[in-house]
């Protein structure tokens, strides 16, 4: 809908073998639904020029995108308002269109509960409780967090993600192959430059330029990265436009080579495809072998089995890794009412200091024979060993206990 068929094929190929997309698909992080929702929303939005019913599907996708990641709350309205403005400017949509206002109602219905959540939790209105739904006052709202970084620090961080292809987090970016392979940024930059040039040329001629929509989402991702300190999954809305631009960049590169080396036209395309395929095979080999070991601790390998042993002991369970309390609560299946009645909050609100017989220690606890300890990889076990504790290894976790 935006580029030609050859670019679409290249973009589809890049998406299938792209490290970022593969890791995003395998790691079930809820925020990683956002890029797909925005992509479907954009697709149906563009198809609306052919048939007005697609606007309703676009509104549905953009409405669902609001629930995929709080980060997009600000950018979905921007994308929709500027997109509608551009279609009206180009005469492809009229302000009085029933499909336009019908779609606006759909988005508004999806957005209304989120607006109420903000109004309740910022103290503008009281809690809402009805027979059909309720909106409580939450103990903690992540949208209230501030990042405390300057514009230039954010820019440096974003540049590291886009050009060095890493945010330093093993679960987000494989250090050896990057997010779209080391050479991939060259084709993306070519595609970006070509997209901007094509849009500017068509704008001056008053021609319809679908590149506008691709650049719009890219700029939203760029603005997000410049105004907050992001990591790969937080700025994930930028990567699908970049991959499409990468496909466009390959097509531009192959066309240029065909112009100066007409006899080698086919081989240039084959060479580009082979370069990506070889890189993909190398990445796949790394991903299912070395990376699995490197990332085991980050994904708390063995935690479930260690907790099962701890529950059998009937003793107090100490966990010394911060930030994993939701996973612990899920594994032990603690009833909600027990959690609410026994939780004690720490200074790192909303993480509890304890709940039931579970203790979440920000610092490693001292040996206690009345408790068992689940320690992260690399923890100092010497004090426990000196006290006669035994150690069992479960994945990346050490299960430490005293045997009577």
Task: Please annotate each region the language model reported.
Residues 3, 38-57, 65:
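Membrane-interface transmembrane helices that cradle and orient dolichyl/undecaprenyl
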Residues 11-16, 62, 66:
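Short helix- or helix-capping micro-motifs
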Residues 265-311, 321-336, 340-352, 356:
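Membrane-proximal, lumen/periplasm-facing interface regions of secretory-pathway glyco-
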Residues 75-190, 328:
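Transmembrane-lumen/periplasm boundary regions of multi-pass, lipid-linked membrane glycan transferases
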Residues 20, 26-31:
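Short acidic/glycine- and proline-prone juxtamembrane loop motifs at membrane-interface regions
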Residues 309-323, 331-404:
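Luminal/periplasmic acceptor-recognition loop/helix of membrane-associated glycosyltransferases
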Residues 24-25, 74, 185, 208-257:
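Hydrophobic/aromatic-rich transmembrane helices and adjacent perimembrane loops
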Residues 35, 56-62, 71-89:
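Transmembrane-embedded, aromatic-rich helix segments that form part
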